[in-house]
Amino acid sequence: MNKFEDIRGVAFDLDGTLVDSAPGLAAAVDMALYALELPVAGEERVITWIGNGADVLMERALAWARQERATLRKTMGKPPVDDDIPAEEQVRILRKLFDRYYSEVAEEGTFLFPHVADTLGALQAKGLPLGLVTNKPTPFVAPLLEALDIAKYFSVVIGGDDVQNKKPHPDPLLLVAERMGIAPQQMLFVGDSRNDIQAAKAAGCPSVGLTYGYNYGEAIDLSQPDVIYQSINDLLPALGLPHSENQESKND
């Protein structure tokens, strides 16, 4: 029996699932840290902070940077300089700086993963409504989808500012299913992190976990999605469609 035979719609996470956004996010984080004369983190470290929205990203970046600066100053025999500066105020300033810099680098620092456009096109052609659920700040979402030429595939888009509770809370997924006019158990959710899988489970949606995204350095199988795929186009045969690589061969 096909586990997904009752699926009537598919929703996707964005960062780490459809797009590699780490270069742009890391650049904006580091520019914001540098502007506050804090140590810069680098892409490899920033990747481990992605997934819970910009506010949490700033909190993680600031916590690391303050600790890193304190350690460096201690090794130099210098006193700490952050004790009298409220972390909450620094997070607020860091977020403003991040938003400014990310608006400048988001498009050039974000790339579609392989087979994404073909997979979305095949699902849309099958008549399945497609949704997007991301914790990314809403103002960045639509311009990015347009720049990547994938906005046309989605009938419902939920950004991080569109709901009070972000993933892993089920609210964003439940809202997408409601707008699609289907039950949560009829909507497949595809993501790359434990937040995605936890949200799907809480909403009652079947889930696909992808192995290539930003899952805090954890293997996606630890979150126990219903199915694990190495590539996004592995989703197509499970939904009764030819694999996109096979489809491309037919079109050549």
From Swiss-Prot:
Name the record gives this protein: Phosphoglycolate phosphatase
Annotated function: Specifically catalyzes the dephosphorylation of 2-phosphoglycolate. Is involved in the dissimilation of the intracellular 2-phosphoglycolate formed during the DNA repair of 3'-phosphoglycolate ends, a major class of DNA lesions induced by oxidative stress.
One Gene Ontology biological process: carbohydrate metabolic process
Enzyme class label: hydrolase
Entry keyword Metal-binding: yes
Chemical reaction(s) catalysed: 2-phosphoglycolate + H2O = glycolate + phosphate
Catalytic-site annotation from UniProt: 13 (nucleophile)
Pathway stated in the Swiss-Prot or TrEMBL entry: Organic acid metabolism; glycolate biosynthesis; glycolate from 2-phosphoglycolate: step 1/1
Subunit structure: Monomer.
A GO MF label: phosphoglycolate phosphatase activity
Binding, Mg(2+): 13, 15, 192
EC number of the protein: 3.1.3.18
One of the Pfam families matching this protein, by short name: Hydrolase
One GO cellular component term: cytosol
Cofactor: Mg(2+); chloride
Protein family per UniProt: Belongs to the HAD-like hydrolase superfamily. CbbY/CbbZ/Gph/YieH family.
Keywords linked to the UniProt accession: Carbohydrate metabolism, Chloride, Hydrolase, Magnesium, Metal-binding
